[in-house]
Regions:
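Intrinsically disordered, low-complexity terminal tails and inter-domain linkers enriched
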Residues: 4-24, 357-359
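Generic C-terminus detector
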Residues: 334-406
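Short, conserved charged micro-motifs
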Residues: 39-41, 205-209, 280-284, 355-369
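A short, charged/proline- and glycine-enriched loop
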Residues: 22-28, 267-268
Length: 406
């Protein structure tokens, strides 16, 4: 294994191959975090003492319509410029500056590993998706190969960061002036997509934070405790699998509960997997959606609704917010092995019980009760869905009109 990791409850091997010995392309690693101090500390640790490593750091200045580009290596700051953008957004930053700058750094010849440090609170998936397309043969970045996608998180604050309802704008790390994403939404997306999660803080004293990391990171990924354990050579010795990364981040690929033996002393984290072949009743779902999807939980998965049986619907909740929508049809969905996926409801809920001495919050019990209540009963389904014909579609504001839904 390229990573020396903390003992992990995940027994599965790292599915991504090491680069071929004769692969001379420049390694490209992508770093995401919600904390500017963690980002800068990680970048410093990666370039110090590694003269062949260079880091490209971006910060979006939405109010100015610009981004700040900083390039550093072991010798210090190589570049520090403010670059105007057509639109001050993440996709424009990648298209207008990251891609040409990465190509220039790869062509320079001084470095064989580039670390792209994303703007604080940026999600790695859309950036890596764009970079994967650009690193194919004949594309603009074909001199680079995707190495490691990593997320850096602090286990001491992770329970608060993930489960509370603070917004990124309230914390001062929003990508735009009106960024209404929850901190927990961003953090969860970073952890769920990463090949490697690097933690700071004490994983023993903050066992719940460490437990939440393990419940969210994908099967086959790694966790390393401490920035001191992070080495650029380890990152370069890995090859990111874009397909596996997309699958981890997809609502169909949500990680299920950990083995019971994996719990460490002091770990109050928990996972509840809500699964049924039956669809949700739309009216009851709307009535109890807050009980099922809001509060101090991270919930993610797929569901189907009795009055639109062909629609594959996504469920994504964190930081007190919940988003539902359609992903297409069940006929288009396949497993990682390419097999068809039958319509089903599967939502994985992750949370933490209150510390000892504090009153219980009853979240797990509330979620389980709401799930049982909103499922359509066998008697309701016996007529093939006729009972829902002609009724007002109460979920249309979120899922679209049934005539337009796929």
């Amino acid at each position: 294994m390229p990573f020396s990791s903390h003992p992990s409850p995940d027994p599965s091997p790292d599915p991504s191959p090491d680069p071929a010995p004769d692969d001379t392309r420049v390694a490209l690693s992508v770093l995401a975090t919600i904390d500017p101090v963690l980002r800068d500390s990680a970048v410093f640790g990666l370039v110090v003492g590694a003269p062949r490593v260079v880091a490209l750091r971006h910060d979006i200045r939405a109010a100015e319509g610009a981004l700040r580009r900083v390039v550093v290596d072991a010798s210090g700051v190589v570049e520090d410029e403010v670059v105007p953008l057509e639109h001050a957004c993440l996709s424009c930053a990648v298209r207008e500056d990251a891609v040409p700058t990465l190509r220039r750094l790869a062509d320079d010849g001084r470095w064989d590993h580039v670390v792209l440090a994303l703007p604080v609170a940026a999600e790695s998936l859309p950036v890596v998706r764009a970079l994967a397309a650009q690193t194919t043969p004949g594309a603009e970045l074909d001199r680079l190969r995707l190495a490691t996608v990593l997320a850096v998180a602090d286990v001491d604050t992770l329970e608060h960061d993930l489960l509370d309802d603070e917004l990124v704008t309230e914390r001062g790390v929003g990508l735009t002036e009106d960024d209404q994403r929850a901190v927990g939404e961003v953090l969860a997306a970073q952890l769920e997509h990463a090949d490697l999660v690097v933690t700071t803080g004490d994983p023993v004293a903050a066992a719940t934070g460490a437990g939440l990391v393990d419940r969210l990171r994908g099967v086959g990924t790694r966790r390393v405790d401490g920035l001191h354990a992070l080495a650029a050579a380890d990152l370069a010795g890995h090859t990111h699998d874009p397909v596996a990364g997309e699958r981890r981040a997809h609502p169909l690929g949500v990680r299920g509960p950990l083995p019971r033996r994996a719990r460490r002393a002091g770990d109050r984290s928990w996972t509840v997997e809500l699964r049924s072949a039956r669809p949700f009743d739309p009216e009851r779902l709307l009535r109890r959606i807050e009980d099922l999807g809001t509060g101090r939980v991270r919930s993610r998965g797929v569901f189907h609704v009795a009055n639109r049986p062909d629609s594959l619907c996504a469920w994504d909740g964190a930081g007190g917010q919940l988003c539902i929508g359609t992903l297409g049809t069940w006929d288009d969905a396949t497993t990682a092995e390419g097999r068809p996926v039958e319509p089903h409801t599967r939502v994985v809920v992750v949370g933490a019980t209150p510390p000892e001495g504090e009153p219980g919050d009853g979240v797990r019990e509330r979620v389980l009760d709401a799930f049982r209540d909103v499922l359509a009963t066998p008697d309701e389904l016996a007529d093939g869905g006729l009972r829902w014909l002609g009724r007002t579609d109460v979920l249309a504001p979120w899922l679209g009109a049934r005539t337009d839904a796929v």
